[in-house]
Amino acid sequence: TFHSHYLGYGTGYLEMSMLYGITELDFGAGTNICFLEDDAYEKFDALPEQYTKSGYRAEMLHGYNDSLYNRTVTYPRLGFSDLLFSADIQALDFPWEGGIYGGYYMRDSYFFQAMLDRMEDINSSGERAFLYGITMENHQPFDPEKFNYECQIGVTSESLGEEDMAIVRVMLEGITRADQALGDLTDALWESEEPTIVVFFGDHRPNLFMTDGDTVYTKLGLCPDNDTVGWTPEEISDLYSTDYLIWANDAALLQGQAGTRRDSSITAIGPQLLELTGQPVTRYWALLEKVSQVCLTNTELYFVDGTGTPSAGVEEAALSDEARELLQLREDVLYDAMYGQQYITAEMNEPVQ
């Protein structure tokens, strides 16, 4: 299970939480964490910088344009050397047969080939690659005609009418194409001599509205209605989560964890990757790793502890005193950096000895 903070939207906010370790709860109500003061993104070394300081080159690829979430301002400050959006990816001019677009957006298969092209180019220059890719093929809208009514997997339902099922089939076809593209990517990496780890995750579930305005989740009885006010913590945790996969072209890279299952989250996946790769980390990321052991998700809507147990909030969670002290320490460190006198901010960017 991969716990998220949003349902149906919020990709840029989730990226900021994953790559930098901050959430909306760390700031005042209504604060957009993608549009903070520019220097806020330089208080701590971000996840990519844990790798670039060891000789990696960090690049971001996005299958759409650069208009969303202030990425062109914030991402360079998080350690990315280059940002490649749709037009930049197409300008790479790598060998490709077939169409570039699937439905309304760039095909995942084409996008992954671009990532392979960038990895090979970076490796050939003598560097290792930290690549962060954001695919788009299965993004909303889910209009029935999006994929020309194609659905490679048969699906039926006793709860949904044919018009609603046409929408569901669009999402299912997008998932199928993503799965096939991931298979092509891992097949290519099997043939690569470069030791490579792939982290593949869905940042949030789609809203997937049906013809009458209800979501598919309401129709299938997974929640009482579209308004989360009446949902239980268990319902929120279920629908505010997706799946994730960590794969490597050499099982030894997974440190004996190949084939295992482990709950993770938007804020826990970074520390999890750092642990797997044995990367030298700063005190800030060491703190986030410890926090992830007691807290997978903490938002205004719900809280999930380190075992995957949801609660309505941190106050209601069955946490030990030590766990609460750890959460308070994280809060204090961030407050000092963002609003205080930065008494310990520099020290938090020092490597763990």
Model feature map: region roles:
Residues 1-353:
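Solvent-exposed soluble domains appended to multi-pass membrane proteins
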